């Protein structure tokens, strides 16, 4: 009795179909992985720029010779999320918390709980002359002619160029509250008196 030949079915085999599905899944996985990495890179880039790369311009010569008029500084916006401003820090703040006011750049000379007074051109903190002072005699004492006691959230700031600075000595500025501070000025771009570099 003659054997009947089996007919081969047309179309792709089961193994080929499984291979094609596996290939498509791998491509999809690689695409999703690439999209995820791009998203992470963009997110980190934006976060770094926001945290360390926001710029502010110095207005006037109140911070000379360290910073000159029009010189740009970079703001570290997360520095004071983990620690408080320290004496000697150069900060960026909005005077009186006014969102429409131009950002101001000044140096912290006294911190919460300190007493401040300007006596005969000398800045006196807690009864001692401010040793970190690199400025000339502070002729205009302003409101600091009388002793000032800083509250638990207040800072006393001055410009390095005391003869041309509107700062905490002025009744228009006064003590700076923590909520007014945008961040720490940590890097300056090239200016007329200096190359780009970290702010000391």
Predicted regions and their residues:
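Beta-strand-rich cores of mature extracytoplasmic or soluble domains
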Residues: 144, 148-200
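Short, surface-exposed secondary-structure edge patches
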Residues: 62-66, 79-84, 107, 113, ...
